[in-house]
C-alpha cells in the first residue's frame, strides 16, 4: 500500500510539473508575441476603418523614410477596402540585438477576395511597428 501511494505521489508530481511547465512556456511565448500581435491588430484595424494616415503612423521609421504619407494613402486606397482579417501566426526573434517579427494575416477584402500576408515588424524604441 505504501509503495502504491509513493508511485501515485510521483505520478501526480510529474503530471503537475508537466502542466505547470506547459503553462509557464505558454505565458513566456505569449509575452514575447503579444506586442507584435497587438501592433499588427492596431495597424489592420486602422486599414479596415479606412484610416490610412493612422496606419501610416504605425509604420517603422525606415518605411516612413522611403514612402511619403500621401503615397502610402494612395497605395492603400487602391488596394481595396479590407472587410476583415484574421491573425493566424506570430513569430518573434532577436538577432544581433535587433528584435523583429513576422505576423501572418489572412485578409478578406470587400467583394470576398482573400489574401494571406506575411507582415514584417520591428521593435523601435520599445514599440512594435509594421515595416513593409
Label each region the model flagged.
Residues 2-45:
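Short, low-complexity N-terminal intrinsically disordered segments enriched in polar/charged residues
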Residues 7, 52, 120-123:
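Secretory-pathway extracellular proteins and peptide precursors enriched for disulfide-bonded cysteines
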Residues 10-11, 56, 127:
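Secretory pathway export signals and precursors
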Residues 13-15, 60-62, 129-131:
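Functionally engaged cysteine thiol sites
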Residues 31-36, 44-48, 64-67, 109-113, ...:
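Extracytoplasmic/periplasmic, Sec-exported soluble proteins
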Residues 42-45, 52-100:
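Short solvent-exposed beta->alpha transition segments
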Residues 93-132:
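Exposed beta-sheet edge and beta->alpha loop/turn motif
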Amino acid at each position: 500500500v505504501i509503495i502504491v501511494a509513493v508511485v501515485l505521489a510521483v505520478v501526480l508530481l510529474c503530471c503537475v510539473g508537466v502542466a505547470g511547465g506547459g503553462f509557464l512556456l505558454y505565458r513566456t511565448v505569449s509575452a514575447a508575441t503579444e506586442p507584435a500581435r497587438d501592433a499588427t491588430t492596431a495597424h489592420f484595424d486602422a486599414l479596415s476603418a479606412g484610416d490610412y494616415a493612422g496606419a501610416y503612423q504605425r509604420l517603422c521609421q525606415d518605411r516612413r523614410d522611403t514612402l511619403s504619407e500621401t503615397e502610402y494613402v494612395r497605395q492603400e486606397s487602391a488596394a481595396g477596402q479590407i472587410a476583415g482579417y484574421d491573425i493566424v501566426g506570430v513569430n518573434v526573434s532577436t538577432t544581433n540585438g535587433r528584435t523583429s517579427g513576422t505576423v501572418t494575416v489572412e485578409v478578406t477584402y470587400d467583394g470576398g477576395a482573400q489574401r494571406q500576408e506575411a507582415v514584417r515588424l520591428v521593435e523601435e524604441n520599445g514599440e512594435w511597428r509594421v515595416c513593409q
